[in-house]
């Protein structure tokens, strides 16, 4: 009831009397509303904020509130009069209410049903709720309630259903929860609840549903849980619960779902779990469980989904699983399972998904698996399986995804494969398969990826593949395929990649190749193609990489190739091309790699080559180029990997402009006719690791830099006029050559020595001359690192930098006590990370990768490839937001490759966000971390030469130093963009929750995949939620965000509760702006996502608009990290 204040004069008595009458009337009507109605009005007026006026008929003129919106009443006692009606139900769900719940809620003592779900209510849950002792159902979910759960709920002895999920509640689950003896449903997931689960849960013997996932619970699951004999659903995923799974779970025989993924469980899976014969879903993935899979699981006759992946389970797959007749999905991937695949799995007639990849399985693939008529997805990759592909697979009518790569399979691929199966992904690469490509593999017109690389397949590409209109990528590298280039491929309008390298294709490249309009990758290296390049190649406007090296192609380069404006990599090396280079090559402004070596090109190098400012590697060795080296080559400011002009007919002086190439690491000018001095500007080549000037006519003194002074004589052979360094002294008075007078005849003995020595020298000289003549007639590979397409990618010449930090293996072993587990600070995708304090006191991080150096099996090089990937990537990078690599080495004692990194004292962003420390980071700190990571990633995408895709951006791969500055690390999957010699990562590139949606159907990783992953990291920083979400909420954070914005619009309720405690609108608006940037990064279509450079600009602009408010206090509020 409102209060009115009036001013009136004494003579206005009549007006005063009228007003007094109205006030009296209002008081009378308010007092006529019963007590429940008055409590409800207090809820509305002193708590709720009803912006949409949903509670418009709540007013005090009614006798009872029983007709109000959301209110239901029941009679109390035998009377049906209005005085006997009490409020028993209050349903205000989805009313768009905000504000708080007033303590007056405790006055509704007859309330049985309370539903305030799906609003924007904040504040604490009032402790007065305990007065509603008749409550049976209380739904407070999907609001923004904070604070702790009031202990007064123990008074609600009649409560059957209690739902507080999707709020911002903190603190423990109170021990008093055990007093709710009638409780059947307890739903508390997606909050910030902490501490151990209370033992009093064992008192809830009527409990059927307990869901408390996505909180910060720790400790063990109490053994008392075994007393909840009516429990049907146990969901505790995405917490920090540790210890062993209690065997008492096996007593809960009514359980239907056990959802415990992504915790810190260790130890064995208890055998007692086999007692759960009603269980339908068992999800234990993403933990640290060890030991064998219990055979007793085979007793769980109702099981439909069995997820044990991403653990450390070992032993064999129990054959008893064959008794699980209702199972539809089994995923045991990413474990340490060994032995053979049991044939008993073929008895699971309902099986639709079987993932066993990345284990240590051996033996053959049982042909009995062909009986699984419902099988749609089978992935047995990255194991040691042998024998043939079961012929029965060609009869699986539901098969869509068949991945068997990286095994040792042999025999012929079943020729009927695809005839009856709607295949969309087939990857058999890196095996020892033979025979022909199955002719019907695309019979159902669904195939998007066919990868048969690195096998022994022969014959032609069958017409069935050439007519496969759905095909996006055809990868048959490293086989024995024959025939001419299949012109029919260019009728496939969706085809983006043709990779036919290292086969036996022959004949000319047909002009029809120009009709492959969407082609981005055309790799034809190491075949027997001949004739000229067709002019029609110029029509491939989307072409990014073009590799025809190691063929027998002739003729000139068509000038029309300049129309391929998107070209980044052009490799024409090791052919028989002739003529001069077309000046139009200089208009390919995106070009990063140009390889023309070992051909018969002649004439001058066109000065327009200097326009290729993105070029990182220039290979022109072994040709007939003549004239002078154009000074415009000094404009190639991005040139980094190599400039190779060796074995040509260049003359004149070396242009001093070459000294402007500050990033250049290898320079080869040997075997030409160059004269004059080595320019003094070469002292500016600070990145140079090696160069070769041999067999020219150079004179004068070597540059005074250390690299020139320490070079061996072989780099300068055949240049009589050079001096300095290890050559002769430039001072004639200090000549190192003996004076002729000293060789005059002396004693007879001395004469004989001279004769013998002279004879030996003469013989050696003749031998050297013969060797030089041989190499002049047969030019060798230039000294700069240039990887042959047929050679393995794993070469010594691939190491582009020299270790500078003086750390020895002995220091590392002593600092880690021989790599003892107590020094482990993390486990990455490709290795284990140890903390090591060096004798100097410097703390470093040591990543240890098990090596496979002793084996020659092509399938055993994954870790070495990972080692090289990190070295090749990190060794060339210097950026404040990229983890610095100090050095690398190989430790023979443990057969391990070691990478020595800068140590990050605060660990990973993932640990800070999801390890119970997120409350320690305010928004300015999180924003600074986001901007730093973005700048590091933008450097990889736009400033590295060549550009780099990270492939595994996630919060655990963003490391934080003591000043809360972000450093992007873990380059185990890093890939130079469009570098065909890079290891083909056929397995999933990335981590669950961060993988861009297009990867599922293209199997292609682009910069836009990194941007999607970064968007997920932004969402983690903003929401505090993990990247993987419950399936009913979308399954991942990006989908959850889209759904939340769709259902509730973009408001601050989407943000981490720890962030919304601030009351500054500028900061809140800034967080909403960054959320919009995150949503933009996670757009479903790659073309809709910004570039990383654009992301950085958007973040900077958003911070500038927020102004000085975005200043972190975290660094001063938090104690420094513990000393090493």
Curated annotation (Swiss-Prot):
Location, primary (coarse class): membrane
EC number from the UniProt entry: 2.7.11.1
Gene3D superfamilies according to UniProt: Phosphorylase Kinase, domain 1, Ribonuclease Inhibitor, Transferase(Phosphotransferase) domain 1
Keywords associated with the record: ATP-binding, Glycoprotein, Kinase, Leucine-rich repeat, Membrane, Nucleotide-binding, Phosphoprotein, Receptor, Repeat, Serine/threonine-protein kinase, Signal, Transferase, Transmembrane, Transmembrane helix
Residues exposed to the Extracellular side: 33-752
UniProt keyword annotation of Iron-sulfur present: no
GO molecular function: ATP binding; protein serine kinase activity; protein serine/threonine kinase activity
Residues bearing PTM Phosphothreonine: 808, 816, 1002
Classification via InterPro entries: Kinase-like_dom_sf, Leu-rich_rpt, Leu-rich_rpt_typical-subtyp, LRR_dom_sf, LRR_N_plant-typ, LRR_R13L4/SHOC2-like, Plant_RL_S/T_kinase, Prot_kinase_dom
GO cellular component terms, A-Z: membrane
Annotated ranges, domain Protein kinase: 819-1100
Signal peptide residues on this chain, from the entry's feature table: 1-32
Subcellular compartments: Membrane
Residue positions where Phosphoserine is found in the record: 986
Start and stop residues of the LRR repeats: 86-109, 110-132, 134-156, 158-180, 182-205, 206-228, 230-252, 254-277, 278-300, 302-325, 326-348, 350-371, 374-397, 398-420, 422-444, 446-468, 470-491, 494-516, 518-540, 542-564, 566-588, 590-613, 614-636, 638-661, 663-686, 687-709
Top enzyme class: transferase
Cytoplasmic-side segments: 774-1124
Membrane topology field: Single-pass type I membrane protein
Modified residues (Phosphotyrosine): 901, 939, 994, 1001
Assigned protein family: Belongs to the protein kinase superfamily. Ser/Thr protein kinase family.
Keyword Membrane found: yes
Residues the record marks as carrying a glycan: 72, 96, 131, 192, 275, 314, 395, 494, 547, 611, 644, 684, 692, 697, 710
Name of the protein described by the UniProt record: Probable leucine-rich repeat receptor-like protein kinase At2g33170
Binding locations of ATP: 825-833, 847
Segments passing through the bilayer: 753-773
């Amino acid at each position: 009831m409102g209060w009115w204040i009036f001013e009136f004069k004494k003579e206005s008595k009549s007006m005063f009397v009228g007003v007094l009458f109205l006030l009296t009337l209002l008081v009378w009507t308010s007092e006529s509303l019963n007590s429940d109605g008055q409590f409800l009005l207090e809820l509305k007026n002193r708590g709720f904020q009803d912006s949409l006026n949903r509670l418009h008929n709540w007013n005090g003129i009614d006798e009872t509130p029983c007709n109000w919106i959301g209110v239901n009443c029941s009679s109390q006692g035998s009377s049906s009069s209005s005085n006997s009606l009490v409020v028993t139900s209050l349903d205000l769900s989805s009313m768009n209410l905000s504000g708080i719940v007033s303590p007056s809620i405790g006055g509704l003592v007859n309330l049985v049903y309370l539903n305030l779900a799906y609003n924007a209510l904040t504040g604490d849950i009032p402790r007065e709720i305990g007065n509603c002792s008749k409550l049976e159902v209380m739904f407070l979910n999907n609001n923004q309630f904070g604070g702790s759960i009031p202990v007064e709920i123990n008074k609600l002895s009649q409560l059957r259903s209690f739902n507080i999920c999707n709020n911002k509640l903190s603190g423990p689950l109170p021990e008093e929860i055990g007093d709710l003896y009638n409780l059947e449903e307890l739903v508390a997931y997606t909050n910030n609840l902490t501490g151990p689960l209370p033992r009093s849960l064992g008192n809830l013997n009527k409990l059927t549903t307990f869901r408390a996932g996505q909180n910060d619970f720790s400790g063990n699951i109490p053994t008392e849980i075994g007393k909840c004999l009516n429990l049907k659903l146990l969901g505790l995923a995405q917490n920090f619960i540790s210890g062993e799974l209690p065997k008492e779970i096996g007593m809960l025989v009514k359980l239907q779902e056990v959802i415990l993924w992504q915790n810190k469980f260790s130890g064995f899976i208890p055998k007692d779990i086999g007692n759960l014969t009603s269980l339908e879903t068992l999800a234990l993935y993403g933990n640290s469980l060890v030991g064998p899979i219990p055979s007793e699981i085979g007793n769980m006759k109702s099981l439909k989904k069995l997820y044990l992946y991403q653990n450390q389970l070992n032993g064999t797959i129990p054959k008893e699983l064959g008794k699980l007749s209702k199972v539809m999905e089994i995923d045991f991937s990413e474990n340490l399972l060994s032995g053979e695949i049991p044939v008993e799995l073929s008895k699971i007639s309902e099986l639709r998904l079987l993932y066993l990849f990345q284990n240590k399985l051996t033996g053959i693939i049982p042909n009995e698996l062909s009986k699984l008529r419902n099988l749609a997805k089978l992935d047995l990759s990255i194991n040691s399986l042998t024998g043939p592909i079961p012929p029965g697979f060609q009869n699986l009518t539901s098969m869509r995804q068949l991945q068997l790569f990286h095994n040792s399979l042999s025999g012929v691929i079943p020729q009927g494969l695809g005839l009856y199966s709607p295949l969309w992904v087939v990857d058999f690469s890196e095996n020892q398969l033979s025979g022909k490509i199955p002719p019907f593999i695309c019979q159902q017109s669904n195939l998007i990826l066919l990868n048969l690389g690195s096998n022994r397949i022969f014959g032609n590409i069958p017409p069935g593949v050439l007519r496969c209109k759905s095909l996006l990528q055809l990868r048959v590298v490293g086989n024995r395929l024959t025939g001419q280039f299949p012109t029919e491929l260019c009728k496939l309008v969706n085809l983006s990649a043709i990779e036919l390298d290292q086969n036996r294709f022959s004949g000319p490249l047909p002009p029809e190749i120009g009709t492959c309009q969407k082609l981005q990758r055309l790799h034809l290296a190491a075949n027997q193609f001949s004739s000229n390049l067709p002019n029609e190649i110029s029509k491939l406007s989307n072409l990014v990489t073009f590799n025809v090296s190691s063929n027998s192609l002739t003729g000139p380069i068509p000038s029309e190739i300049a129309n391929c404006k998107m070209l980044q990599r052009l490799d024409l090396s090791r052919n028989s091309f002739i003529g001069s280079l077309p000046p139009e090559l200089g208009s390919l402004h995106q070009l990063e790699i140009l390889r023309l070596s070992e051909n018969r090109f002649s004439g001058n190098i066109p000065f327009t080559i200097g326009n290729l400012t993105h070029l990182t590697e220039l290979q022109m060795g072994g040709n007939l180029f003549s004239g002078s080296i154009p000074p415009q080559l000094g404009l190639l400011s991005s040139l980094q990997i190599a400039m190779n002009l060796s074995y040509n007919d260049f003359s004149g002086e070396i242009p001093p402009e070459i000294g402007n190439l500050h990033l250049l690491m290898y320079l080869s000018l040997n075997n030409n006719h160059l004269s004059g001095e080595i320019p003094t500007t070469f002292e500016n080549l600070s990145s140079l690791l090696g160069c070769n000037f041999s067999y020219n006519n150079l004179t004068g003194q070597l540059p005074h830099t250390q690299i020139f002074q320490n070079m061996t004589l072989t780099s300068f052979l055949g240049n009589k006029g050079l001096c300095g360094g290890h050559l002769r002294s430039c001072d004639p008075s200090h000549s190192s050559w003996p004076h002729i007078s000293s060789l005059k005849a002396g004693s007879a003995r001395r004469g004989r020595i001279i004769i013998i020595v002279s004879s030996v020298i003469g013989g050696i000289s003749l031998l050297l001359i013969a060797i030089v003549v041989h190499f002049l007639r047969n030019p060798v590979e230039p000294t700069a690192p240039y990887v042959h397409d047929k050679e393995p990618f794993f070469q010594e010449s691939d190491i582009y930098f020299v270790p500078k930090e003086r750390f020895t293996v002995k220091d590392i072993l002593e600092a880690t006590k021989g790599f003892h587990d107590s020094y482990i600070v993390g486990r990455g995708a490709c290795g284990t990370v140890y903390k090591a304090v060096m004798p100097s006191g410097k703390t470093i991080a040591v990543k240890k990768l098990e090596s496979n150096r002793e084996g020659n099996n092509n399938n055993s090089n994954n870790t070495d490839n990972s080692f090289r990937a990190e070295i090749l990537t990190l060794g060339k990078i210097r950026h404040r937001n990229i983890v610095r690599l100090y050095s690398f080495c190989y430790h023979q004692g443990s057969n391990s490759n070691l990478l020595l990194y800068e140590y990050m004292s605060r660990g990973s962003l993932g640990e800070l966000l999801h390890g119970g420390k997120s409350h320690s980071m305010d928004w300015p700190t999180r924003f600074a971390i986001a901007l730093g990571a973005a700048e590091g990633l933008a450097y990889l995408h736009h400033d590295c030469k060549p550009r780099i895709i990270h492939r595994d951006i996630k919060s655990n791969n963003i490391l934080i130093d003591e000043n809360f500055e972000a450093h992007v690390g873990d380059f185990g999957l890093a890939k130079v963009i469009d570098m065909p010699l890079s290891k083909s990562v056929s397995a999933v590139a990335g981590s669950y929750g961060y993988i861009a949606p297009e990867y599922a159907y293209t199997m292609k990783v682009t910069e836009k995949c990194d941007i999607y992953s970064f968007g997920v990291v932004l969402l983690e920083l903003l929401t505090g939620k993990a990247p993987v979400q419950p399936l009913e909420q979308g399954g991942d954070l990006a989908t959850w965000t889209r759904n939340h914005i769709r259902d509730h619009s973009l408001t601050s309720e989407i943000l981490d509760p720890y962030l919304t405690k601030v009351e500054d609108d500028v900061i809140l608006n800034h967080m909403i702006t960054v959320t919009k940037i995150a949503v933009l990064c996670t757009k479903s279509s790659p073309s809709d996502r910004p570039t990383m450079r654009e992301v950085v600009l958007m973040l900077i602009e958003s911070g500038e608009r927020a102004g000085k408010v975005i200043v972190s206090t975290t660094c001063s509020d938090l104690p420094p990290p513990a000393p090493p």
